[in-house]
Amino acid sequence: MPGFAPVNTGGPELEYAFYEAERRVLGIQAKLHCWARDDAHRRFDDLFNLVCDPAFLLVAWVRVRSNKGARSAGVDGYSAYAIEARGVEGFLDRLRSQVKDRSFRPLPVRERMIPKAGGKKRRLGISTVTDRVVQASLKLVLEPIFEADFLPCSYGFRPGRRAHDAVAEVRHFASRPRCYEWVVEGDIKACFDEISHSALMDRVRARVGDKRVLALVKAFLKAGILGEDRVLRENNTGTPQGSILSPLLSNVALSVLDEYIAQAPGGPSSSEWQRRVRRRQGFPNFRLVRYADLCRGRHKSAYAELWIMPTGLLDGPPGGRGVVLGAA
């Protein structure tokens, strides 16, 4: 994973400590990723100490502080700048103690409604800075493990991958000698709002055996939402949009879809012989390109839309649509 660009971490001493911490974190992340990659069934039982490790918390703080959302405060009213003014080292020491003795409790997420095209609105959750730092530390620990499991078709919110890479992959499938002729596009229904907590936690447990880390992840999922009307709502499904952990957890949940499609007849896991037989029989072969909750499949037959839509995982029109490549 790439290092950070130089940032203002709060003084020369803290800046030096950050670079030392970053080196330690990157080394541990590399080990976690290798262990997960080399053993697809390995469960990690001692991750909690990494989450509250001073190096991980410091790197997590720098990520939160350098993010454009550092100006935004959660329900406690404190922005990252306000915390920085009161002293970063003391803040991180107190936070580490709270996480380590398990007295830390996430606060409700402050909800804001962001306008979307067509007059609709999208929910955005703003966590407290304290919660963001713990989430960022959790992500530093969990991401290299789950990255070992994610398939190449997934591009959204992954290190070293971006939207342009997904577009390039789609173009690659459309070019010779592949010449896929159809694109079926669809959005995952209410992806961030409707993900089942129990199903998601089952997926996380497949890799994480540390009950303290599992409890921490679940606590963030259940933290509740404080709406713009100041009414506190329970959060029984989904991951709050805007949360640092949400993109990773959404990819963990949606990796089930990636694996299902990869193993389906005519999918990426099919042999060349199987794909040739399907072509002779008039059945489609296909590839999947997923960017977060947006899916695009390249197909060689109009039957593709009839196959993929009834799975219930994709919205129909206007969320899903078929396009003939080269058509006006």
PLM region spans:
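Long amphipathic N-terminal alpha/beta scaffold segment
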Residues: 79, 83-86, 91-113
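N-terminal core-binding DNA-recognition domain of tyrosine site-specific recombinases/integrases
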Residues: 122-125, 181
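Short beta-strand-to-loop capping motifs
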Residues: 83, 128, 297-301
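Non-catalytic, polymerase-adjacent accessory regions of viral genome-replication enzymes
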Residues: 1-89
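Conserved polymerase palm-domain catalytic core
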Residues: 99, 108, 117, 149-313, ...
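Glycine-rich phosphate-binding segment of PLP-dependent enzymes
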Residues: 142-150
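Nucleotide/phosphate-binding loop and acidic/charged catalytic motifs
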Residues: 138
